[in-house]
Amino acid sequence: VYTYDGGSAIFDGFGEIIDCCAPFTPELKFVDLDSGCRGRNAIPIPVAQGSDIGSAYSALNYGIRKFLAMIGMKRVVIGVSGGIDSAVSAALYGTVLDPGDLLLVSMPSMYTSRTTRDLAGKLARNLGCLYSVMPIQDAVEFTVGQISKTPVINMKTGKRQQLAVAPFVAENIQARD
C-alpha cells in the first residue's frame, strides 16, 4: 500500500518548520510570509511526533478509504482463516466500513482446526459485521481429482502418466482453491 501522508511543511531559511498541514487529510493552506523577517522571527511550530504504529495505522486507514472511493467500492468480502493476516485485514476494513458492508467468510475444509474456525467466528462477532461459513472440502476434492486425472504426456516418447497429489499439496490446494 502506497500512501502520501500530506503533512506538507514550510521551512524558514534556518530549516525551522514555521507551518505545516495535517497528515492524511486533504488541506489547502495559505501562509502569509512576512518578507521583512525572512522567516527567522517566525515562531517555529511543534511537529506532532506520532508512534510508528499510530502512523502506520493512519496511513493504512487513509489508503483503504481512498482506494475504495477511487474504485467505487462500498462493500467488501474478506476470507477469514482465524489467522493473524485475515484478522488484521478485517479489523482495518472494519474501521473504514459500516459493519453491514463488511462480510467475513470462513471457508473450512478437513484441514481447518476447530480453534481457527472458532477464531474466525469470534472475529466477526467482535467487529459486528456480516459472517458466513462456506465449507470448501468438496471443491478441494474436485481440484485434487482434476489434477490426478489429467494425463501428463512425455512428448518425446508418448508415454502417459498421472500426477499424484501428496497430502501436503492437497492442504495447499485448500488454501488457494
Question: Where do the model's predicted regions map?
Answer:
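C-terminal beta-strand edge segments of enzyme domains
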Residues: 1-61
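Structured core elements
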Residues: 9-10, 17-18, 30, 77-79, ...
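Generic secondary-structure signature for well-ordered alpha-helical cores
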Residues: 13-16, 20-23, 36, 61-69, ...
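A conserved beta-strand->alpha-helix junction
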Residues: 25-32, 101-169, 176
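Glycine- and acidic
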Residues: 42-51, 73-78, 105, 160-168
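Conserved acidic
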Residues: 48-56, 112, 169, 174
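Phosphate/ATP-binding catalytic cores across multiple sugar-kinase/actin-like superfamilies
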Residues: 52-77, 177
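ATP-dependent adenylation/pyrophosphate-handling site
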Residues: 74-80, 84-121
